[in-house]
Amino acid sequence: MGYSAFMNGLDTTNGGLAAEPLIRLGVFAAVLALLVAWELLAPRRQPTVGRWRRWPGNVGVVVIDTVLVRILFPTAAVGLALVAEANGWGVLNVVAVPDLLAIFTAIVLLDLIIYAQHMLLHAVPLLWRLHRMHHADLEIDVTTGIRFHPVEILLSMVIKLGAVVVLGAPALGVMIFEVLLNATSMFNHSNVRLPVGVDRWLRRILVTPDMHRVHHSIVARETNSNFGFNLLWWDRLFGTYRDQPAAGHEAMTIGLPQFRDPSELRLDRMLIQPLRSNRTEGRK
C-alpha cells in the first residue's frame, strides 16, 4: 500500500513528480550541513590547502552540473522509470517480481553499474581525461564528493537512464538509489574521523571515508583501487579492494602528480582540465 501511494504521488498527470527533486535537495542539504559540521569538529586530516581556495570551484562546478542536468534531463531517472513501467520496458517490468524485491534488486544492480562505470572512467584514457578533474582536488572533503566535470555528469546520466530502462527499475527504487548515491558520495569523501571499530564494522557493507580516501591517493596503484561509492561488496568481489594507504591517512598525498598548482583549483581551470596534456601525470 505504501508503494502504491508513492507511485500515485509521482504520477505525472497530477504534477507529483515535482516532489522528487525537492526530496533529493532536502536530503542533500541536510547531509552536506551535517558532514561540514562533523569535519570542523572531528577532522581525519589537517588540510594542506585552505577551504577558501578549494570550495568556490567545487561548489561552482556542482551548480553548473545541476543546471545542465535539469535542462537536458528534466524528468530525470525517476520520470523515465515511470515511463518504462507504463510501457512494460525492462527486465523487472517483464518478470513477475514482488515490489520490495524489485526495489532492492534495482538498488543493488544500479550500484554495480556505477562501480563498473567508475572502473571504465579510470581504464579508458579519454574517459579518464574527464574523470581526473575529480581526482585533481588537492585535499579530500565533503565538497570533493560533488566535484565532477559537467561532461562526466552528463555521460553518467545517459548511462544511468539506459540502465533504468534495461532493468525496468521501479521509480521508488530509483529515487532511493539517487538519494543514497548523493549521500554516500558526500560521506565517503568527507574528512571525518570514525572510531576504528566503527570503520571496521561499516566496511562489512559500506564504503567508508578511510576506504575511499585511499582511492584519492597520488600513488597510482592506490588510485586504481576502491572504486565503490556505496556498497563495499564490488571491490572485494572483483579484487580492487585496498585496506589502507601505504603512507597512512595523515601523511598521504591527495591528488594527481599533474595539476599540483593551487591555481588549478579555480573553476575556469577545472573545466578545461580534460583538454590539457597528461604527459607529466605518471599514472602508468
What is each stretch, according to the model?
Residues 249-284:
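A membrane-cytosol interface segment of integral membrane proteins
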Residues 14-23, 93-98:
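Interfacial loop-to-helix junctions that mark the boundaries of transmembrane helices
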Residues 63-76, 88-251:
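Membrane-embedded catalytic scaffold of the fatty acid hydroxylase/desaturase
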Residues 1-19:
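Short, strongly hydrophobic alpha-helical membrane anchors
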Residues 19-27, 50-63:
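Loop-to-helix transition at the N-terminal end of transmembrane alpha-helices
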Residues 1-5, 32-43:
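Alpha-helical transmembrane segments of multi-pass membrane proteins
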Residues 2-7, 74-86:
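Membrane-helix interface motif
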Residues 38-55:
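Membrane-interface helix-loop junction between the first two transmembrane segments
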